[in-house]
Design a protein with these regions (language model features):
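Short runs within selected transmembrane alpha-helices of multi-pass transporters and secretion channels
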Residues: 74, 142-161, 169-177, 198-211, ...
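Hydrophobic transmembrane alpha-helices of multi-pass small-molecule transporters
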Residues: 65-68, 180-184, 210-214, 285-288, ...
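Short alpha-helical transmembrane segments in multi-pass integral membrane proteins
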Residues: 1-23, 81-146, 190-245, 301-366, ...
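Transmembrane helical elements of multi-pass membrane transporters/channels
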Residues: 21-40, 142, 153, 176, ...
Length: 448
């Protein structure tokens, strides 16, 4: 298969420059994707009520559980397509493209049905306070009504990135984000629709981004999407699931542990809930950077592993580790120093700001310790091994967090005891990943 410019940019050239050239569009896209919920949070917090802000915040872990598993499933298609593309296997790219898009449509419908039907029940299980429950239930019902568009967009963006195109997904997100802001102002501020308006604005913007990338794939010259070619290839589906199911389970385990933590946060009342919501939005940049490096290394390793450029795989790990740790370290320092100023963007309630500032001071300084987890997990998946990173994360992070919440937090019931479970599990998981990579994956790359 004739390789396009985008592929050459990933499999050839100075590694740190090529990774950054791929990383920045992903980061920008992640930023605008995060802006969906951030704009909702700011407008709901300032123009509706503190209870509405808490209601939107408490739905986060639940939304992530539903979306996480099925998005993880879809990531299997992205990894396989990147390997086919790097190897120059045109038929493999075509088959993965059509199987992946079909899978995203089916999964999107499933998420929509499950989310609308089970979302409110799950919120009750999370001990959502009575003064927030109705608004939170309304938000998740409207949000999950747009699950099909969200799932389709994520698959489309992953496919384009796997082929080295990280720019057009960003363009679609910029347009969608602008649509989201306008619709938030119209529906929440203008029409006074409250949390339902915020959720509906997000759904509309997701539809816009999904349609834009659908048009891009249909018009792609080298590897176009053909509606007549949509369908599931069983053999390819098994390969996708072999990578995607463990990735999805990992995200679910992460989000289940976060849901348990959210349940603990809920037990402290609406003020702490609002503070936690504001903190998570404040800390979003850290995880946007982390996630962008994770996507970049997965795609980079996938293409270079498929092209048998194992030397570049090894070097990319070192480069991404250095850049991610350095970047997140600087962000964490700035966030800790200016935490009250940043929190003031989301709310004017002084008690919420002070509690949020305390949460940041406990968690954020340790964020860089999670970067080895992101980089090594992405590397392993790019090489086609999704089970091992899933097992490491589930045991080192999720299980430990659950045990911590059920023992230490239950016994002492302080905000400090709840917050420390994050840095504690980050450090533990990073150590396990470093040892696993050095003992198992590094020798494999050197052997071939």
């Amino acid at each position: 298969m004739k390789r396009g410019t985008a592929t050459k940019q990933i499999t050839e050239g100075v590694i740190w420059k090529q990774i950054l050239a791929f990383f920045f569009p992903i980061l920008l896209g992640t930023f605008f994707q995060q802006m969906y919920n951030t704009v909702d949070t700011i407008i709901v917090g300032r123009f509706v009520s503190t209870q509405a802000l808490a209601a939107v915040g408490t739905t986060g872990p639940l939304v992530n559980i539903f979306n996480g598993f099925f998005t993880g499933l879809g990531s299997g298609a992205t990894v396989i397509l990147a390997q086919f593309y790097g190897a120059g296997n045109k038929q493999g790219v075509r088959d993965t493209l059509h199987t992946g898009v079909t899978l995203s449509l089916l999964l999107g419908l499933l998420i929509m049905v499950l989310g609308i039907g089970l979302g409110p029940v799950a919120l009750k299980w999370m001990h959502t306070p009575a003064d927030c429950l109705d608004m939170a239930s309304l938000y998740v019902r409207v949000y999950f009504a747009g699950a099909l568009a969200s799932m389709l967009y994520n698959m489309e963006a992953g496919i384009l990135r796997a082929m080295g195109d990280s720019q057009r997904p960003v363009i679609s997100l910029i347009v969608a984000c602008l649509v989201n802001i306008v619709m938030d102002l119209v529906l929440v501020v203008g029409l006074k629709m409250g949390v339902a308006g915020a959720a509906l604005a997000t759904v509309i913007s997701q539809v816009v981004s999904a349609v834009m990338l659908l048009v891009v794939l249909l018009r792609e010259k080298e590897n176009p999407l053909e509606l007549s070619g949509l369908g599931i290839q069983p053999k390819l589906l098994r390969r996708i699931l072999a990578i995607g199911v463990p990735a999805g389970l990992q995200l679910v385990m992460f989000d289940l542990s976060n849901t348990l933590i959210q349940s603990g946060i809920n037990s402290f009342g609406s003020t702490v809930m609002a503070s936690w919501t504001a903190y998570t939005k404040t800390d979003a940049l850290t995880w946007m950077v982390s996630g962008a490096f994770g996507v970049a290394i997965t795609t980079f390793v996938g293409q270079n592993y498929g092209a048998h450029r194992y030397d570049r795989v090894r070097q990319s790990v070192r480069v991404c580790l250095a850049m991610s740790i350095g970047t997140v370290g600087v962000i964490s320092l700035l966030m800790t120093v200016f935490r009250r100023v940043i929190l003031g963007v989301y709310t004017t309630d002084t008690s919420v700001i002070e509690t949020g500032a305390y949460i940041i001071s406990v968690i954020v300084p340790f964020a860089a310790t999670f970067m080895p987890v992101e980089i090594f997990a992405g590397t392993m998946r790019g090489m086609g091994d999704s089970m091992r990173p899933t097992a490491i994360i589930c045991l080192s992070v999720c299980v430990v967090r659950v045990l911590w919440i059920m023992t230490a937090v239950k016994k002492y019931h302080t905000l400090l005891m709840l917050c420390v479970c994050y840095p504690m599990t980050w450090v533990l998981c990073a150590i396990v990943f470093i040892v696993t990579y050095l003992r198992t994956f590094r020798p494999r790359l050197e052997a071939v």
